[in-house]
A protein has these predicted regions:
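Lipid-exposed faces of alpha-helical membrane segments in multi-pass integral membrane proteins
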Residues: 13, 50-53, 57, 102, ...
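Short membrane-interface loop/juxtamembrane segments of multi-pass integral membrane proteins
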Residues: 78-96
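Alpha-helical transmembrane segments and their membrane-interface junctions
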Residues: 19-23, 45, 98-121
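Alpha-helical transmembrane segments and their immediate juxtamembrane interface regions
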Residues: 2-10, 24, 121-160
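Membrane-interface elements of multi-pass transporters and channels
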Residues: 28, 32, 67-68, 119-124, ...
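Long, highly hydrophobic alpha-helical transmembrane signal-anchor segments
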Residues: 1-57, 130-137
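Membrane-water interface of transmembrane alpha-helices
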Residues: 57-77
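Membrane-water interface at transmembrane helix exits
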Residues: 23-26, 61-65, 113, 153-157
């Protein structure tokens, strides 16, 4: 169960950071360094910097977790989908069905919200960035909801 929770929490963090980094890429942090004959200027969103750091650190943390857990070679690639026995295979199937239902529901609702955001933006705001942020937020929220529902269902089924 630890492997599913670890992977799901990592995925949720990844999707949240990715969503925030891509929702607000236009809020740059400007910094610079100069030396004799050398100049460096950085224009980067702080959220994008956190996302990039997470992309570097998460695989390292995952490798350490896999090594310390003593998982088999067959389960290293897909921790949340790996099954050690028939019971875990059935649990994974039920959790995947739940995640699929949540994913489809969120996508249908998200399309409606996106259409409403497009209409409101075109009618009242005239701001294309608001529609972009809404779309990225919907995609990130959908991925978070699917990952969280998979983890919750998997843990509930495992404890039965």
């Amino acid at each position: 169960m630890k492997k599913v929770v670890f992977e799901s929490v990592g995925n949720v963090l990844l999707f949240v950071l990715m969503g925030l980094a891509f929702m607000f890429p236009f809020s740059p942090y400007e910094g610079g360094a100069t030396a004799d004959g050398f100049s460096l200027s950085v224009h980067l969103s702080p959220l994008m910097a956190v996302f990039v750091v997470f992309l570097v650190l998460y695989p390292i943390a995952r490798a350490v977790f896999v090594r310390r857990s003593g998982l088999h070679a067959s389960t290293r690639d897909n921790l949340e989908l790996a099954a050690d026995d028939e019971r875990e295979l059935q649990i994974t199937g039920r959790a995947l069905r739940t995640a699929y239902r949540v994913l489809m529901t969120c996508l249908i609702v998200g399309l409606g919200v996106l259409a409403a955001a497009q209409f409101l933006s075109a009618t009242f705001l005239g701001d294309a960035v608001a529609v972009y942020r809404t779309a990225v937020g919907i995609i990130a929220a959908t991925l978070v909801a699917a990952s969280a529902s998979y983890c919750i269902r998997w843990c509930l089924e495992y404890r039965k």
